[in-house]
Structure formats: structure tokens, C-alpha cells
């Protein structure tokens, strides 16, 4: 697929945005809206800040300043620290930056620095992300069904609320699973390898319904995206 793929060029950035209002104002804080400011855990892999500027700032730092793109394939399955993966998914899921922008940034890096398996692999991950969008568009609500898009309940699960709750709280018999679940709850983030392991544990070791896991991820992930989340769980 990727050999014949044609990615559209970037749209030119508008020079002037005319607004229907004249007076400047500020967005209310969470406290002003009646919510508590979330406490940042110092163990978080990255201090994620929302918005387009922050997304571009991190992409530039990770790609160009730290030079991590050209090592991505070697480090992508890491668990700890900011460098092992791009961590662009929160900004992608929030619409702060687009997959097309990331693609052209990869191409620019390949032209100006180096093109290797790692630069290709980040592009491949973007294709994987797009694949789940095509699946969602093709199958619609079946993506969220217990039997998945095939309607096959391969692992029907044995509902056991205690097992599910211990998984959610990071209080299982597996310390690796526990560490990843605690990270998710406290920071809203979990590595890709961590996600694969805790999902496998919930389904194959605890015998629980995959949808319960997908819904818990939906409530807690800062990079939650319906197609990627449910697509990866079903996969």
C-alpha cells in the first residue's frame, strides 16, 4: 500500500484569520469552571501540554534537537523516558497537529539528515493509524461490538468484577502489569508495549471482556482516539 500511496501536500497557512468578535478574552481555568487542576506526577514520561504550538515544539525537539527519529525503530518498544517514541499521539488525537504534517516533517528529515528504517517506521505507524480509521469508516459501530468486525467472540470472557477492578487499580499478581496500570491512572499515558501487555493479561490471563479494557483506556488515556483504541484492542 505504502509504495503507491500519494500524500496530499500541506495546505498553505492562512495569513489572516478574521474573527466575528473584536474584544480579546481568556479561556477560563479549570478551577473557574468548578474542576480541580490535575496534579502532575513527577514520574510522567513527558509534561504534555495541549495546543498546536506545544505539539510542534515537541515534534521539533524530539525529531531535530534530540535526533530521535533516526533511532525510532530501535527504541520504539521502550517503557521509560521521553525519547523512546515520538509521543505525538496526544496532539494527533486532539487535532492539534495532523498526520499529514507529521508525514511531511519525516520527509524533510529524510532529505536534510538521513533516511533509514527508523524514519520509514514512523511513517508506517501513521499508516497503521489510518488503517484503523478506514476500518471504522467501513464497519461503523461493529468496531465497538463484543465480537468485533467479524462478529466472532473468540474470547467471550467470564465477567468477574473483582478481577477487572484489580486490573484497573494495578493490584494484580503481575507487577509489570501493575506498574503500567498505575502509570495510566496517574499520568494518562502508557507505552505501546505496556498497552499490549496489559490488554493481553486482561483477556488471556484474567479471562475478561476486551470491551471493559477498551472502555477503561477510553476514560483514562490522554491520546484516546476511538478508531485506534478499539481497533488495537480488537486486533
What are these regions (language model features)?
Residues 1-151:
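Glycine/tryptophan-enriched, flexible segments
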Residues 84-235:
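Active-site-proximal binding-pocket segments
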Amino acid at each position: 500500500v505504502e509504495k503507491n500511496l500519494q500524500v496530499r501536500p500541506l495546505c498553505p497557512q492562512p495569513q489572516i484569520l478574521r474573527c466575528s468578535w473584536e474584544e480579546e478574552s481568556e479561556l477560563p481555568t479549570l478551577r473557574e469552571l468548578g474542576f480541580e487542576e490535575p496534579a502532575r506526577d513527577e514520574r510522567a514520561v513527558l509534561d504534555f501540554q495541549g495546543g498546536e504550538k506545544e505539539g510542534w515544539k515537541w515534534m521539533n525537539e524530539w525529531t531535530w534537537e534530540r535526533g530521535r527519529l533516526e533511532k525510532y525503530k530501535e527504541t520504539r518498544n521502550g517503557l521509560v523516558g521521553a525519547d523512546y517514541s515520538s509521543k505525538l499521539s496526544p496532539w494527533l488525537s486532539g487535532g492539534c497537529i495532523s498526520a499529514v504534517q507529521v508525514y511531511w516533517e519525516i520527509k524533510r528529515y529524510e532529505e536534510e539528515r538521513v533516511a533509514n528504517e527508523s524514519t520509514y517506521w514512523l511513517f508506517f505507524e501513521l499508516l497503521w493509524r489510518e488503517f484503523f480509521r478506514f476500518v471504522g469508516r467501513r464497519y461503523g459501530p461493529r468496531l465497538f461490538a463484543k465480537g468485533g468486525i467479524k462478529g466472532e467472540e473468540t474470547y467471550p470472557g467470564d465477567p468477574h468484577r473483582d478481577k477487572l477492578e484489580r486490573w484497573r487499580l494495578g493490584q494484580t499478581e503481575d507487577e509489570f502489569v501493575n506498574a503500567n496500570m498505575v502509570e495510566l491512572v496517574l499520568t494518562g499515558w502508557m507505552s505501546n508495549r505496556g498497552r499490549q501487555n496489559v490488554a493481553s493479561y486482561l483477556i488471556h490471563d484474567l479471562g475478561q471482556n476486551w470491551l471493559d479494557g477498551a472502555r477503561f483506556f477510553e476514560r483514562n488515556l490522554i491520546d484516546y482516539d476511538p478508531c485506534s483504541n478499539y481497533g488495537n484492542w480488537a486486533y
